[in-house]
């Protein structure tokens, strides 16, 4: 297939391409692309971007052909904000960092953080009273942010850092998406939002540097992630990470771990509120497994239905946009792509494709029963990516979600407020614009 015969997404605007659609109606836009073909030409401004809608092609770029792809030009824009940590690293440097950090993020290594997350969830709910209106979107994002901060920094000197991080990270995340998609001329205009972003970005960098310096001076292993990052050594060379690299890895953990986890927690409680039968089954399972005791790591594997609820939430509200760029010429779906070509894929669009997920807008945890789940094609369900760049924090995210859901639902149920319209907002992740609910003790 010649390049000029690749189907073009409809609705492009001269000079802006499909940028307005990507900014204003991103979810509708990416889910519509499958109607055009397996490879679809999208334009961001004047930059061509090839969207992949077939799971086999997406799996190829993430696994068998991953060495032929870099992060792409759009991701390069994001590096100015999120740094050069594992989530933006490429090639040999990515392999080195992954090798250094992988032992820190195994599920057994993460199991020790169960109590940390549980205590934070308990502290959040202790402020609730019967019938209280709870801003679930804000509360769950704050819970996730505090959990990530405490998993990273457990020392007493971290208390100020946690407060700065809680204040700054949401401001930066709100700006990240626009910095990736909009021309630099537009993101450089000194608006109030831009000034807030610059201030938050500078404060976050400063507090991370201060934490690293304090840990270096005090030494020792506090059992947190920062201690382990500072101590991580290459088993062959004995090399450790520079302070600058540790800084960028800490920065990456906040950007990768906070927004998605907070949004998923909020969506879990939204879906439970919308489906009383599903909520009842979750309550019954948690009551039976915990029997009135605090949730522990050994309980997590027994919460099978709760796990399926979380998996279905990942399907419904996954990230909607990931860019890549070709490093060498290759063919995808009959389309020849020269080196330097930008491509994209959308987990959200794949997860809402009725070819792979019947009734994709229906929240159905039992679609993840083993006999049904095995019918999902490889590459069609990728909430954490796949291959060499699969999310290193997957185990931590699943532990955080399961512990938080079990801890909260053991004592409380969150009921929807009649007449409230919950709108999906796509920035880096898909999160609720506002989600007020009423807290009722169980």
Region locations from a protein language model:
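Cytochrome P450 catalytic-core helices
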Residues: 260-285, 394-412
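Conserved cytochrome P450 K-helix/beta-meander segment immediately N-terminal to the heme-binding cysteine loop
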Residues: 67, 345-373
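Cytochrome P450 I-helix active-site segment
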Residues: 5-12, 114, 118, 166, ...
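Cytochrome P450 heme-thiolate monooxygenase catalytic core
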Residues: 1-7, 70-78, 89, 93, ...
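N-terminal membrane-proximal hinge/A-helix region immediately C-terminal to the signal-anchor transmembrane segment
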Residues: 1-96, 111, 115-123, 159, ...
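Short, conserved phosphate/pyrophosphate- and ester-handling motifs at nucleotide-, phospho-/glycolipid
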Residues: 54, 257, 340
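Conserved cytochrome P450 K-helix E-x-x-R motif and the immediately C-terminal K′/meander segment
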Residues: 16-37, 206, 293-333, 354
């Amino acid at each position: 297939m010649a390049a000029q015969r690749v189907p073009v997404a409809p609705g492009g605007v001269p000079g802006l391409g499909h940028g307005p659609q990507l900014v204003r109606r991103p979810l509708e836009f990416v889910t519509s692309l499958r109607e055009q073909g397996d490879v679809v030409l999208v334009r961001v401004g004047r930059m061509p971007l090839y969207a992949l809608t077939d799971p086999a092609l997406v799996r190829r770029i993430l696994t068998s052909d991953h060495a032929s792809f870099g992060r792409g030009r759009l991701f390069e824009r994001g590096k100015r904000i999120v740094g050069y940590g594992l989530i933006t690293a490429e090639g040999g440097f990515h392999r080195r960092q992954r090798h250094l950090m992988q032992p820190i993020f195994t599920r057994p290594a993460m199991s020790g953080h169960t109590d940390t997350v549980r205590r934070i969830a308990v502290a959040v709910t202790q402020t609730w009273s019967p019938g209280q209106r709870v801003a679930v979107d804000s509360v769950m994002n704050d819970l996730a942010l505090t959990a990530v901060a405490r998993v990273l920094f457990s020392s007493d000197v971290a208390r100020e850092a946690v407060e700065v991080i809680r204040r700054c990270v949401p401001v930066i995340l709100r700006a990240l998406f626009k910095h990736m998609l909009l021309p630099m001329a537009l993101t450089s205009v000194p608006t109030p939002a831009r000034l807030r972003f610059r201030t938050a970005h500078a404060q976050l960098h400063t507090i991370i540097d201060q934490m690293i310096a304090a840990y270096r001076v005090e030494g020792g292993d506090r059992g947190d992630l920062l201690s382990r990052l500072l101590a991580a050594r290459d088993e062959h060379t004995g090399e450790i990470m520079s302070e600058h690299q540790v800084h960028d890895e800490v920065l990456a953990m906040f950007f990768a771990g906070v927004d998605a986890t907070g949004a998923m927690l909020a969506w879990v409680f939204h879906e439970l509120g919308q489906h009383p039968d599903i909520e009842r089954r979750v309550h019954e399972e948690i009551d039976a497994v915990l029997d009135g005791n605090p949730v522990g790591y050994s309980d997590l594997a027994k919460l099978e239905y709760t796990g399926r609820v979380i998996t279905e939430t990942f399907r419904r509200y996954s990230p909607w946009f990931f860019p890549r760029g070709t490093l060498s010429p290759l063919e995808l779906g009959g389309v020849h792509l020269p080196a330097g070509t930008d491509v994209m894929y959308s987990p959200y669009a794949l997860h809402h494709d009725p070819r792979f997920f019947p009734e994709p807008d229906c929240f159905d945890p039992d679609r993840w029963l083993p006999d049904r789940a095995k019918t999902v094609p490889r590459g069609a369900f990728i909430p954490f990516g796949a291959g060499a760049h699969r999310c290193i924090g997957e185990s931590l995210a699943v532990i955080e979600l399961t512990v938080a859901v079990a801890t909260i639902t053991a004592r409380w149920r969150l009921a929807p407020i009649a007449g409230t319209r919950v709108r999906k907002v796509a920035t880096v992740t898909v999160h609720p614009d506002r989600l007020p609910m009423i807290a009722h003790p169980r």
